[in-house]
């Protein structure tokens, strides 16, 4: 008699599960001759709602997980930058070491979502970076 395999899945499906944080465990019961698979879901993918909470199906979608991760990353950014401390970014046009933190490896100015600056300071920062590039320091 051949062993019964429950939940047999293809390798591409396993990769997709792994990419979404679902890891697969196999346990073999020697006495019964059966292979059982249990799936462990990553906690970042599960949503714990308090009792009596009204929820939307969007709360369980991948889009919601991406939004949560995006805003959590912004909250957790512990960058103690001079820019966030109230200094005027235009004053740093001659300091490429400071301004290079706000430029990508290809030389593009990072977006406000990434820098975490206000709209006003982001404009000032962009102007300072362009000035620094124009005078040849960056």
Swiss-Prot record:
GO terms for cellular component: mitochondrial inner membrane; mitochondrial small ribosomal subunit; mitochondrion. GO terms for biological process: mitochondrial translation; translation. Transmembrane segments: none annotated. One of its GO terms (molecular function) is small ribosomal subunit rRNA binding. Its main location: mitochondrion. It is found in: Mitochondrion. Residues 1-16 form a transit peptide. Coiled coil: none annotated. The keyword Hydrolase does not apply. The keyword Ribonucleoprotein applies. Keywords: Mitochondrion, Ribonucleoprotein, Ribosomal protein, Transit peptide. It comes from the Eukaryota. Component of the mitochondrial small ribosomal subunit (mt-SSU). Mature yeast 74S mitochondrial ribosomes consist of a small (37S) and a large (54S) subunit. The 37S small subunit contains a 15S ribosomal RNA (15S mt-rRNA) and 34 different proteins. The 54S large subunit contains a 21S rRNA (21S mt-rRNA) and 46 different proteins. Belongs to the bacterial ribosomal protein bS18 family. Component of the mitochondrial ribosome (mitoribosome), a dedicated translation machinery responsible for the synthesis of mitochondrial genome-encoded proteins, including at least some of the essential transmembrane subunits of the mitochondrial respiratory chain. The mitoribosomes are attached to the mitochondrial inner membrane and translation products are cotranslationally integrated into the membrane. Present with 1210 molecules/cell in log phase SD medium. This is Small ribosomal subunit protein bS18m.
């Amino acid at each position: 008699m051949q062993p019964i395999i429950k939940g047999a899945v293809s390798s591409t499906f396993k990769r997709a599960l792994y990419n979404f944080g679902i890891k697969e465990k196999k346990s073999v019961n020697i006495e019964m001759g059966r292979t059982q698979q249990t799936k462990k879901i990553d906690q970042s993918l599960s949503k714990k709602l308090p009792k009596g909470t009204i929820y939307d199906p969007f709360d369980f979608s991948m889009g919601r997980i991406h939004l949560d991760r995006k805003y959590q990353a912004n909250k957790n950014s512990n960058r103690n930058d001079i820019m966030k401390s109230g200094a005027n970014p235009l004053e740093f046009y001659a300091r490429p070491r400071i301004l290079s933190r706000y430029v990508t490896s290809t030389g593009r100015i990072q977006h406000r979502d990434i820098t975490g600056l206000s709209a006003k300071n982001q404009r000032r920062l962009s102007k300072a970076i362009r000035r620094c590039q124009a005078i040849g320091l960056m």
